Amino acid sequence: MILSNDELKKLISLGKLKVDPLYPDAVRENGLDLRIGGEYAIYAYEGAVVRPCDLDDAKPLFRVVKADEVVIPPRNFVLLTTEEYVKMPEDVAGLANLRSTLARYGLSIPPTVVDVGFEGNITIEVVNNSPNTIVLKRGMRFLHLVLIKAEGRAAYRGAYQGQRGVTPPKGLKGEC
């Protein structure tokens, strides 16, 4: 079941869903709009051979940029972080979607689930499928998070729990 704005406001007022900061225009008809944070990550090198299964840590592959603008080269991607720190209830998951206006410029994100019980800034991959450089601004609404009720409860125990700022991927050594 997708939660409406009334249900979202109720969860926020009860302290079950936390969004900090919470802007007046964040709670929409069927989800939350989240804003671009103050940093992003982009690959530090072009043409490198990346083997996720051989990596303990992928952070050295990325350059973190602190800026008021996010520059996304043509046919490339960046990792963006939300300005908001989100704490999900243990019985609510989120489905992250790019705002449709940005998709019409040629941007996309992969299907992304924000797990029940997740807490932290959300790091999301934004792909520029267009032939043009696209520049986004810090603080603009870019991510629409649709919240859905999960059956039962679960605790999130993932590697990204409590992340702050943009978080490059973990290495997959030992998982492959």
From Swiss-Prot:
Keywords of the record: Hydrolase, Nucleotide metabolism, Nucleotide-binding
Gene3D superfamilies, per the entry: 2.70.40.10
Q: Which EC numbers does the record give?
A: 3.5.4.13
Q: Does the keyword Nucleotide-binding apply?
A: yes
- Spans traversing the lipid bilayer: none
SUPFAM superfamilies from the UniProt entry: dUTPase-like (SSF51283)
Q: Which InterPro entries match?
A: dCTP_deaminase, dUTPase-like_sf, dUTPase_trimeric
Q: Which residues bind dCTP?
A: 99-104, 115, 163
The annotated active site, in chain numbering, is 125 (proton donor/acceptor)
The reactions it catalyses are: dCTP + H2O + H(+) = dUTP + NH4(+)
Q: What class of enzyme is it?
A: hydrolase
Looking up Pfam families in the UniProt record yields: DCD
Q: Which domain of life is it from?
A: Archaea
Tell me the pathway. Pyrimidine metabolism; dUMP biosynthesis; dUMP from dCTP (dUTP route): step 1/2
Which GO BP terms apply? dUMP biosynthetic process; dUTP biosynthetic process
Q: Which GO terms describe its molecular function?
A: dCTP deaminase activity; nucleotide binding
Under the subunit heading, UniProt states:
Homotrimer.
What protein family is recorded?
Belongs to the dCTP deaminase family.
| HAMAP family to which the protein is assigned, alphabetical | dCTP_deaminase
Which function does this protein serve? Answer: Catalyzes the deamination of dCTP to dUTP.
Protein name, per record: dCTP deaminase
Taxonomic lineage per UniProt?
Archaea, Thermoproteota, Thermoprotei, Thermoproteales, Thermoproteaceae
